[in-house]
Amino acid sequence: MTSRLPPSPATLSVVAALRDGIAQLEREYVPSAALAAELLLMHALGRDRAWIYAHPEHELNPATREQYFFLIARRASGVPTQHLTGHQEFWGLDFEVTPDVLIPRPETEHVIEVALERLGAGSDAGSPRRKKEFRMADVGTGSGCIAIALAHELPSAHIVATDISPAALEVARRNAARHNVASRIDFVECHLADSLLHASRSTGHESRSFDLLASNPPYIGRHEAASLPREVREHEPETALYGGETGTEIYAPLIAQAAALLKPGGVLVLELGHNSAEHVLHLLEAPGWTSVAISNDLAGIPRVASAQRNA
């Protein structure tokens, strides 16, 4: 690692700052270097992308220049861009992100798509189903992105969102408040879904009263840790990454809890790891589940398993 702040020129324009930032990140083989440099410059300037490209000759003042290249050096050392800016977009919404939560990924948006489709509340924003008072659970909520996106799409839904991490729940609560859905989400500290039955009683719901249980559980195997990108392995919370030695161990207890929580006809939606589709399909072959489906993401990778609870 040889990253360091470059010599400060007398003046530095927006376009020159981007050029120099990209070059420094590329020297350290940072993925998506141009995007990272853009986001960090936007953050340092307090401006959006449109402003940056509309003002390429704008000169950075010394304090902004110093902050920007400090951020570039931190990103070059492996710190995720989202931890430096404190933000990540998900489902068109801006989420606060800290090292206490998994950074929301674009592929997790497929969980929202499948959930809405399985509930009959899909792409038509005017669908009467979107006004139904759905009862939902988001297990392992992290930043709250799944629960908050669902609450944003379904204005009468009420959601119980769980996480083992008190620090993650604090981030999720702030995100819920940011998006004006805090009154419809109960945040509960517990491991996976093990305490969700108790949580449902404490928030006034009966067991088997949920219309949906959604989760992006930790599904990476411990044996895969060394192969993860440095920014993931060193900077994201282990409890949100690893689901056991193989990464598939997390699904059996989660599916068992879902069977106890979902009402007849209720829907289970789970994000899948790269090697977990066959294992999850096998678990959902058990009595009690019907309409089992695997949905691929845009890259053609099995990404989401869904099923319906029968009587």
Language model regions located:
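Non-catalytic nucleic-acid substrate-recognition regions in nucleic-acid-modifying enzymes
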Residues: 1-33
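Class I S-adenosylmethionine-dependent transferase superfamily signal
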Residues: 115, 150, 232, 254-258
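Conserved AdoMet
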Residues: 2, 34-35, 39-118
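Conserved Class I SAM-dependent methyltransferase catalytic core
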Residues: 245-308
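Helix-to-beta-strand junctions that scaffold the AdoMet/dcAdoMet cofactor pocket
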Residues: 181, 236, 262-264
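Residue-level signal for inorganic ion chemistry
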Residues: 40, 78, 108, 146, ...
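Conserved SAM/SAH cofactor-binding pocket of Class I
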Residues: 109-227
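Mobile active-site "lid"/loop adjacent to the S-adenosyl-L-methionine
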Residues: 219-250
